[in-house]
């Protein structure tokens, strides 16, 4: 890396690294450093009456206060933080005090990883600390961390810009309290979910991520090219059709927790790459699945929060069963006053116009109903609510309702104004399923790029016979948002999708060289703010030379600066 691309702190840290090497101290040792304690456990278990305890801990140095022969530092490990007392004569019992005077005081930097062996004690101010007897450098940090300070409950200099936090999640995790807890809770959600599903006898499986047909949902897929077979492939938008094949094959119940990909928009509740759990169980229907889902979410909430309640944006949401069950057409009637039962596509279009919804000719009956529900109903369901009995046009993979013509046995679980889960009594009639696929293809012909493609192999599987089955898909990211009280999906994803970083426009070195400048002087010009050849025209030769000289002096560069006359000649070329 060019030294001119580094900050003064980064340059100093690299100088410290070289000094450590000269002292024979490995900045990145290869050997294991066995620890036997964590910060939180030490703080929780300490007793003034107990025998003195020696511990070995390791972590990142987050602060340091040097007071002559004695110092304090704050060590952050994977569990929390603890104060370490560092006394010169304790870590340097002999004549050589280099480890304290040079290494600890001058060559270590905030962010460095160190190992400490010492005994636990309570300071005169009452703080439980570790009295260091041995100090070992474990890893040198070359970039300074943002220094987040806290006083009287107020946070200063916080690392809070959302874009920076999401791009540099590693820094976010280090310096911002509570961020790591989000992802520990996410792990609890997944662990609890797996435990419950496994205890019920269901088998976790893995199905293809690369698929020849993007089936199982209505969404726009990501495409890629499979070179070995010379065919177009799709990143899966759902796991549904492969999991149903396994039910055909004889599994009692199967589930998969994995990534799905939908080539659609990004916002506070959508990420194109998202985690979903899909479950399929034979001999069950959507009524059974509603009851099972209530029990599942109630247990997950207790595991994460210690109760059946979670607070999101000031709203207390109760996951205690049972949840309200409301047919979708009744929900629309309740929220808009329009009764859509028995209405055809043309009549529903008229309702959309009266509601001043933006619609187009590609939208079929199902899409129109979906638009009405999404605009006027969805956001109003804060407490968990099962929206049931969707029209067949909205549900191409769902069994027809046993007693309501034109409707299907499907539910979506709404929580905090968003869909959390989608479930069916699964369609297992292969003839009916083929007819539904054909209807979807008609929508595709009209321009609906989210319509389903016919999956002939799935139809073949159904022809061998699939038992009555219920299935559900639960969005894990949204579930974690609800369990942790966050309003944006990016907060619960370790590395959310982001737009490319903005980069300062910069001309190539060759463009500057063509003017007669040396290649080695170009980074100096960039440091002075001349990133484009055209930038030179905004200044005078004498000023440019002065700026170059200042950079060369500051960074002790052994390069020759161009003369004023040479720069004037170059400026003439730029202006011409």
Locate the predicted segments by residue.
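Compact, charge-rich alpha-helical regulatory domains located at protein termini
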Residues: 500-576
């Amino acid at each position: 890396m060019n030294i001119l691309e580094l900050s003064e702190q980064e340059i100093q840290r690299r100088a410290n690294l070289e000094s450590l090497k000269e002292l024979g101290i490995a900045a990145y040792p290869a050997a294991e450093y066995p620890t036997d304690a964590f910060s939180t456990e030490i703080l929780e278990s300490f007793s003034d009456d107990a025998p003195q305890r020696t511990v070995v801990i390791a972590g990142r140095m987050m602060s340091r206060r040097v007071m002559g022969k004695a110092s304090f530092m704050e060590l952050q490990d994977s569990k929390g933080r603890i104060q370490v007392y560092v006394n010169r004569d304790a870590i340097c019992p002999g004549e050589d005090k280099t480890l304290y005077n040079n290494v600890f005081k001058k060559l270590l930097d905030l962010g460095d990883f160190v190992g400490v062996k010492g005994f636990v004690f309570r300071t005169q101010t009452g703080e439980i600390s570790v009295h260091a007897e041995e100090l070992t450098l474990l890893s040198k940090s070359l970039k300074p961390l943002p220094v987040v300070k806290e006083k009287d409950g107020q946070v200063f200099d916080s690392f809070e810009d959302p874009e920076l936090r999401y791009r540099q999640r590693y820094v976010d995790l280090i310096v911002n309290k509570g961020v790591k807890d989000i992802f520990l809770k996410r792990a609890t959600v997944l662990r609890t979910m797996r435990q419950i599903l496994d205890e019920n006898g269901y088998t976790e499986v893995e199905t293809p991520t690369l698929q020849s047909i993007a089936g199982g949902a209505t969404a726009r897929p990501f495409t890629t090219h499979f070179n070995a077979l010379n065919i177009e492939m799709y990143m899966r938008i759902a796991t549904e059709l492969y999991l149903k094949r396994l039910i055909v094959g004889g599994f009692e119940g199967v589930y998969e927790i994995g990534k799905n990909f939908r080539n659609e928009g990004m916002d506070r509740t959508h990420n194109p790459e998202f985690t979903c759990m899909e479950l399929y169980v034979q001999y069950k229907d959507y009524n059974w699945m509603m009851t099972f889902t209530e029990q599942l979410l109630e247990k997950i909430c207790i595991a994460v929060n210690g109760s059946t309640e979670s607070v999101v944006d000031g709203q207390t949401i109760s996951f205690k069963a049972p949840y309200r069950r409301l047919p979708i057409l009744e929900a629309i009637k309740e929220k808009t006053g329009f009764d859509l039962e028995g209405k055809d596509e043309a009549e529903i279009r008229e309702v959309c116009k009266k509601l001043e919804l933006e619609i187009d000719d590609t939208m079929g009956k199902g899409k129109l109903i979906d638009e009405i529900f999404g605009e006027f109903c969805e956001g109003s369901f804060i407490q968990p609510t099962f929206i049931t009995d969707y029209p067949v046009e909205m549900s191409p993979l769902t069994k027809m309702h046993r007693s309501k013509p034109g409707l299907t046995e499907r539910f979506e679980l709404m929580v905090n104004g968003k869909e959390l889960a989608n479930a069916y009594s699964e369609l297992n009639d292969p003839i009916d399923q083929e007819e539904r696929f054909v209807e979807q293809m008609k929508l595709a012909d009209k321009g609906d790029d989210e319509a389903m493609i016919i999956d002939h192999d799935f139809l073949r599987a159904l022809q061998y016979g699939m038992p009555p089955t219920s299935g559900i898909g639960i969005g894990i990211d949204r579930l974690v948002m609800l369990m942790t009280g966050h309003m944006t999906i990016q907060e619960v994803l370790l590395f959310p999708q982001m737009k490319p970083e903005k980069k300062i426009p910069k001309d190539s070195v060759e463009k500057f060289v063509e003017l007669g400048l040396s290649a080695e002087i170009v980074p100096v010009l960039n440091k002075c703010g001349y990133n484009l050849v055209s930038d030179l025209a905004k200044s005078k030769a004498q000023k440019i030379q002065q700026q170059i000289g200042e950079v060369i002096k500051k960074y002790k560069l052994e390069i020759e600066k161009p003369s004023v006359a040479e720069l004037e000649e170059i400026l003439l070329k730029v202006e011409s």
